[in-house]
Amino acid sequence: MDNQTVINTTGEPVTEQAPAVDTPSTATASDNTPVYLPAGYLSDGYYAITDKGAKYLRPEFVGKYAETMASLLADMKPTDFNSLLREMKRSKKKTLPFEARLTAAAEMLPKALALVHRKKAPALLVTFIKDNLDHIRNDDDWFAYHRHLEAIGGYLSMPAIIKE
């Protein structure tokens, strides 16, 4: 009987339960993640250029895109989001080379994965960070990403503003 119980417990429930639990979660995260990123997000980079050649951060990164991302990450606590930004803020204050800043940005990914694993953040957060990391090529991009994150954090901290 013990062998049958072990075989049944190991074989049937694990095989049947794992797909039943994981499949909807994985399918939901995989299917919904690309849909949730705003259309055209990062397609033209962080910056626009004036007629005279001056580069400036596109306003949607601190406006429309930041507000949209904050509403999609609304289930996340603002303190958890701010903990992701902590190392980025430290690297901004110091005179560091670009590589050190890029490392600080890259450190957000494992922290985001941990938050998603603990169900404290949606899977969209990981996709969002990966997409942004792929577009950071220099200090200007890093600072644009940082400003974008701070705007998202601001909207997350004030949910009443988003709903109005």
Segments (PLM) and residue ranges:
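Small/polar/charged residue-enriched interaction surfaces, especially the RNA/DNA-contacting tracks
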Residues: 1-164
